[in-house]
Amino acid sequence: DHYYYDDFENERTITDIAERSYMPALNALLDMIKANDQYFKVAFSLSGVGIEQLEMHAPQVLDKLQELNETGCVEFLAETYAHSLASIGDPEEFKAQVRMHTEKVKALFGVEPKVFRNTELIYSDDISELVYELGFEGMLTEGAKHVLGWKSPNYVYASAIRPQLKLLLKNDRFSEDLSIRFDDHSWKEYPLTADKYISAISATAEGEKIINAFMNYEVLGSMHAADTGIFDFFKALPQYAERNDITFSLPSEIFAQTRPVDSISVPYPMSWVDEEKDCSSWLGNVLQQEAFRKLNEISERVRLCENRRIKQDWIYLQSSDHLYYMSTKHYNLFSPYDNPYDAFNNYMNVLSDFILRVEAQFPSSIENEELNSLLTTIQNQGDEITRLKKELEAARK
């Protein structure tokens, strides 16, 4: 019946993580906002696929996010709907997914994202061009040393090829103190207290006014369990920040108030993963490269399909997690497979079946010229809608 999903496992995973991490973390963040007279602010990025799973298995998480949204101290960022690698594999698919995600966020929370956060903070000059064309004012990415050199990540930068697109760069030290080292008993700074953390931020060089702490949401309650003190640590941050004249800002607020100090050039995609800060965790071996190639080969035909099930399966097949599970670089804590080869075999079996379904609708015998003509029409319609929306917004201002 071409049904590829383990609904029982999906439900178990989502309900478990919602109970251990999402709900207690959201309650803590809401308390931080209310207890500190809206001094604390936070931005969220949720993929469309993630939102769909929450709608099915943990709708209380979305209700709590809406409650946070109503405080005015929260910003929702745009990203790819499928948490995919479309930005480096298929520009048209990337644009379609971002538009789809923006509509989903707007429908749920009543706000249209102004700032973009790509899957795993992946960024390059070419990607910045696509993000600019989609109408975003800024983007979040990694403050990779091999890109920055002597420069500090603690400023606003701009895209080298689209200077109108502003960039916020992740501060590795202050992000990973929380996401990786917080519960490391061998770390010289252990135990990390809110006082110590804020004092270290205060000690950064004068003029470096923006510290971007980006982390996986599961840091709160899952990667660091409640008994590590992670929730108490977070709850204490606003009061120590205020004592040290450190404020919290949303990405769009920073972009509105701050001019870029310089541009950065990133000819090859970088990410926030591993020491290399590249894309090798998803595309570093032949298994991953073959799966990604095979996936992208059929994208044009899928975009012409009207079948709802094919469209849905296409989105879920593009999740970057599938490729991450095939990585041979390191042990994968979150993989449901015993090894990368099982992950590859299962994915390719599903993808092969999916390709047969697509071929039944648009056989490979159809000439590429005919396909391209249809796709160009669809693409032009999408671009025209984006242009008209921009004109409408400008007229409202």
Task: Go through the PLM ranges and name each one.
Residues V61-A78, R99, V111, Y132-P153, ...:
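Acidic, His- and aromatic-enriched active-site or binding-groove loops in soluble protein domains
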Residues S87-G89, V147-Y155, D177-S179, P260:
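Short, charged, surface-exposed secondary-structure boundary motifs
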Residues L26-L30, L62-Q66, K95-V105, S128, ...:
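Generic structural signal for well-ordered alpha-helices
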Residues E92, A96-L121, D126-L130:
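A conserved hydrophobic secondary-structure block that centers on an alpha-helix together
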